[in-house]
Regions:
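Long hydrophobic segments that form regular secondary structure
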Residues: 7, 12-30, 157, 161-166, ...
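CN hydrolase (nitrilase-like) catalytic-core segments centered on the catalytic cysteine
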Residues: 13-99
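Beta-strand-turn-beta hairpins that frame and shape the catalytic cleft
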Residues: 1-6
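Active-site-adjacent "lid"/gating segments
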Residues: 72-75, 79-175
Length: 175
């Protein structure tokens, strides 16, 4: 039951991107074919925009930008491709190559089940196109920490432990 939705270029930059409604209607993978030109500082803004949209919608967001072969004397395209999963990102700029990453769809769906925003009984209105995709066994391209909830950085670990202790103390205080 994978639902994929597409936006085009500036859709994600708009005040109310179409991906919001698509996510509310069940899309867990959002794709954007873009031709966003390069200006000073735009790359970090673009990364934060895609990362934020992915996190806010608890979705995988695949952003494919025009590359240098499509640049002209008036505009430069850097091929800034981004794959974001619920806020995490993988991006390469001016690399003129394809990027590949995994998106944990089951994790995203699990997170959505815990979020009341996605628990709606409203009727869906967006048009749907059925498709078939073959699933192949592949090696993972990213690694996962054996202890994902324990920060490796000692300062972050101490902060996390303090936070856990305070949450538990406040819970016990209420009893």
């Amino acid at each position: 039951n994978l639902i994929v939705s597409a936006e085009i270029c500036e859709d994600v930059w708009s005040p109310v991107p179409p991906s919001i409604e698509a996510a509310r209607e069940g899309a867990v993978i959002l794709v954007n074919c873009s031709a966003s030109d390069e200006t000073i500082g735009k790359d970090s803004y673009r990364e934060e925009l895609i990362k934020g949209q992915s996190a806010r919608l608890i979705a995988g967001y695949v952003y494919a930008n025009a590359g240098d072969g499509e640049s002209t004397t008036d505009v430069v395209f850097g091929g800034h491709n981004i794959i974001a999963e619920n806020g995490t990102k993988e991006a390469k700029r001016f690399a003129n190559e394809m990027i590949v990453s995994e998106i944990d769809i089951f994790r995203l769906l699990s997170e959505r089940r815990k979020n009341t925003t996605f628990q709606t009984t409203e009727e869906r209105h967006l048009p749907k196109v059925l498709f078939h995709i073959s699933v192949e066994e592949t090696a993972l391209t990213r690694s996962f920490a054996q202890t994902p909830f324990v920060p490796q950085n000692m300062a972050e670990r101490e902060k996390r432990c303090e936070e856990i202790l305070m949450i538990q103390a406040m819970g016990m205080k209420k009893r």
